[in-house]
């Protein structure tokens, strides 16, 4: 890379970083951190464990955001010095190191820029992920379990906490459905582009004749409800069923009827929870999931009105959005953004950042 090109590239990186810093508003974030640090230092903090957890989690996230921005700014500034050293010493190794760091900084900057695109009303929230097997029999159930593992691995790789609320296992293999939380700020904004129908094409391991099978699984992403959302549920409009928790193959995992299924009669929405220790805890968690589904229903109704005004079909639950092809070739391709990866195994192991970033940029472009 010529000296002039390097100079222009560094100016471009610095300019992009300035734009990102303006959107993030680092001074405001530092002020928010100071307030949260004061709250976290209060002797009464853990009198309310749930509130304490939210305060410490948000504090940790904001501190990480600021550190990440400051570190990236430092790396951009250091790049200029590194390239100057390479030129002065005429050292190929130093120049190679500088160019490698330049590529790494450019990638980190792209990732941070994507974060600034998460400006929707609920984007900063934690997320509830609901996956269900659709057409395709046992292959669909197996596919749904693969998707569950994919998202849980993605969260683990990023250091995000997760909690599985409910998993309904299929008889032969895989799962009928699952609901779990991704407990990190901006999890909803990041994962919401995953909502829709996912398609798997492969030679079925469950077919004795080794035939190719196409199966489908639906992914629903919900924002975690907060008190300010005012989602009220009339207990008289609920049907509450209790049952015994079960594991793979229908095996009982609890000797008491602690699992809870809630049916919201006006909308027909059904949610369940079986992973908490008691029936009371399972009902409370199921209520949280139901509130999230009702909030999402309200959001979709509002979005449908906007789409009708714009003549836009939107991105509904039933829209097919990604294909995972394992035979006759190997390719995972997003049908909206055209982003594709030729290594399905890596994708199923949680390497989906490229799809998420492409989806967020695609969504932002559609909003213009």
Curated annotation (Swiss-Prot):
List the signal peptide residues: none
- Keyword match Cytoplasm: yes
Compartments where located: Cytoplasm
The family database entries (PROSITE patterns) matched by this protein are listed as: RF_PROK_I
Q: Give the main localization category.
A: cytoplasm
A GO molecular function term, named singly, is: translation release factor activity, codon specific
Listed A to Z, the keywords are:
Cytoplasm, Methylation, Protein biosynthesis
Q: Which residues carry this modification: N5-methylglutamine?
A: 251
Q: Does the keyword Oxidoreductase apply?
A: no
| Superkingdom of origin | Bacteria
Post-translational modification (record)? Methylated by PrmC. Methylation increases the termination efficiency of RF2.
Q: Under the cellular component aspect of Gene Ontology, which terms does the record hold?
A: cytoplasm
The portions of this protein that span the membrane are none
Disulfides per UniProt: none
The protein's matches in Pfam families, at most eight in alphabetical order, are given as: PCRF, RF-1
Q: Which family does it belong to?
A: Belongs to the prokaryotic/mitochondrial release factor family.
In terms of NCBIfam families, this protein maps to: prfB (TIGR00020)
What does the UniProt record say this protein does? Peptide chain release factor 2 directs the termination of translation in response to the peptide chain termination codons UGA and UAA.
Which PANTHER family does the entry link to? CLASS I PEPTIDE CHAIN RELEASE FACTOR (PTHR43116:SF3), PEPTIDE CHAIN RELEASE FACTOR 2 (PTHR43116)
What is this protein's record name?
Answer: Peptide chain release factor 2
Organism in which the protein naturally occurs: Streptomyces coelicolor (strain ATCC BAA-471 / A3(2) / M145)
What taxonomic lineage is listed for the species of origin?
A: Bacteria, Bacillati, Actinomycetota, Actinomycetes, Kitasatosporales
